[in-house]
Amino acid sequence: MIQQETRLKVADNSGAREILTIKVLGGSGHKFANIGDVIVASVKQATPGGAVKKGDVVKAVIVRTKTGARRPDGSYIKFDDNAAVIIRDDKTPRGTRIFGPVARELREGGYMKIVSLAPEVL
């Protein structure tokens, strides 16, 4: 579960390395974010020469969580880290590459570009 002030790894080549969650989008009662949810975040670490700089406020979609997500068949999917991909307003990623596996739940959320760029979909 990702909440306010949670730090996440960035799983793309947009230039950011680490982001800090400012707000979970999705209504007033939405306190925690899971896989496929959109957050507003601040860039805390960035690589030089990247598209985003340290201090930028960006939107990102969660692609991996340590807590994991429950599937309709009763199984759970868990990852080793909490990671997100920085997106534009039209749900397309800012970067051109995705690093590491992503969850299948992104397909139902309409993030087909992220799913197609990912090296592995679990």
From Swiss-Prot:
Keywords: Ribonucleoprotein, Ribosomal protein, RNA-binding, rRNA-binding
InterPro entries: Ribosomal_uL14, Ribosomal_uL14_bac-type, Ribosomal_uL14_CS, Ribosomal_uL14_sf
Pfam assignment, any one: Ribosomal_L14
Matches recorded under CDD domains: Ribosomal_uL14 (cd00337)
MF-aspect GO terms: large ribosomal subunit rRNA binding; structural constituent of ribosome
BP terms from Gene Ontology: translation
GO annotations of cellular component type: cytosolic large ribosomal subunit
Subunit record text: Part of the 50S ribosomal subunit. Forms a cluster with proteins L3 and L19. In the 70S ribosome, L14 and L19 interact and together make contacts with the 16S rRNA in bridges B5 and B8.
Function: Binds to 23S rRNA. Forms part of two intersubunit bridges in the 70S ribosome.
Similarity annotation: Belongs to the universal ribosomal protein uL14 family.
Protein name, as recorded: Large ribosomal subunit protein uL14
Organism listed in the record: Streptococcus pyogenes serotype M2 (strain MGAS10270)
